[in-house]
A protein has these predicted regions:
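Active-site beta->alpha loop and helix N-cap motifs at the rims of alpha/beta catalytic domains
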Residues: 3, 14-133, 143-148
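Catalytic alpha/beta core domains of metabolic enzymes, predominantly
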Residues: 102, 112, 117-251
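Short beta-strand/loop segment at the start of cytosolic alpha/beta domains
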Residues: 1-7
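Short boundary motifs at domain starts and secondary-structure transition points
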Residues: 7-13
Length: 251
């Protein structure tokens, strides 16, 4: 598997890199959480801007992300607006979603930018090109909170993300049974073995899928989300346990 090197953090090599999500409403609470996270044993902080009370104000978004960049010091910053259709807090029109992404790129503060595969649609390749021109790596994401698609569909979707030049395809599915967790893990292995052009991020959600968040190094998932006190998705495991298990399973 290839790796993505962002300021010395080699995503796709060795232990999966740990992401902590910020899901606070106010700028003050966001920055307070960022200050706490800046001292924790994690590699990256995700700002879930769909939780931000000022999400409709470009000026408020720009100000907050600029302050976040300073507060997080050497931690990587992933900026995400998770749309309602993919399990997020807010709905945006297609035009509003594109405007948000371009605003974040203009701030020159993000290390990584989440771009939803289906929400971006035909604009995906151009958005990825714009992000790369701004020096920002792209996490191209797809989430299914109702089910886990078949392995072939999971692989096909991640390959399409690679073909659009995404740096890190990301896919999450909700398992209805144990076999669904195995399907997602098998898709992850197939990507690592047969399509190693990029690292990938995968997870099976909920309590049933929690094992997928901890065994990424064995199966080929390059990053995992940990719960530092408030989860941003079902099945996230606490940071202390994540670090302990990742160390225990390190190859």
């Amino acid at each position: 598997m290839s790796c993505v090197n962002i300021r010395g953090c080699r995503i796709g090599e060795g232990r999966p890199k740990v992401i902590l999500p910020i899901v606070e409403r106010t700028e003050a609470a966001i920055l307070e959480k960022a200050a706490q996270f800046s001292t924790l044993s994690a590699d990256c902080v995700e700002w879930r801007a769909d939780w931000f009370e000022g999400f409709q104000s470009p000026a408020a978004i720009a100000r907050c992300v600029q302050k976040l960049r300073v507060t997080l010091r050497d931690k990587l910053l992933l900026v995400t607006f998770r749309t309602k259709a993919e399990g997020g807090e807010q709905a945006l029109s297609h035009k509003e979603y594109l405007a948000f992404l371009r605003l974040i790129l203009d701030t020159d503060c993000a290390d990584l930018l989440d771009i939803e595969f289906f929400t971006a649609g035909a604009d995906l390749p151009a958005l990825i090109e714009q992000a790369h021109s701004a020096g920002v790596a792209v996490v191209c994401s797809s989430h299914d909170f109702a089910k886990t698609p078949p392995r072939a569909e999971l692989v096909s979707r991640m390959v399409q993300m690679q073909q659009a030049e995404a740096d890190l395809p990301k896919l999450a599915g909700m398992p209805r049974c144990r076999t669904d967790v195995l399907e997602l893990l098998a898709a992850t292995v197939e990507m690592a073995d047969l399509h190693p052009e990029t690292p990938v991020i995968t997870m099976s959600m909920g309590a049933l899928g929690a094992v997928s968040r901890l065994a990424g190094e064995a199966f080929g998932s390059a990053m995992t989300f940990a719960n530092p006190g408030q989860a941003s998705a079902p099945g996230q495991v606490s940071l202390d346990i994540v670090n302990e298990v990742l160390d225990a399973l390190h190859l």
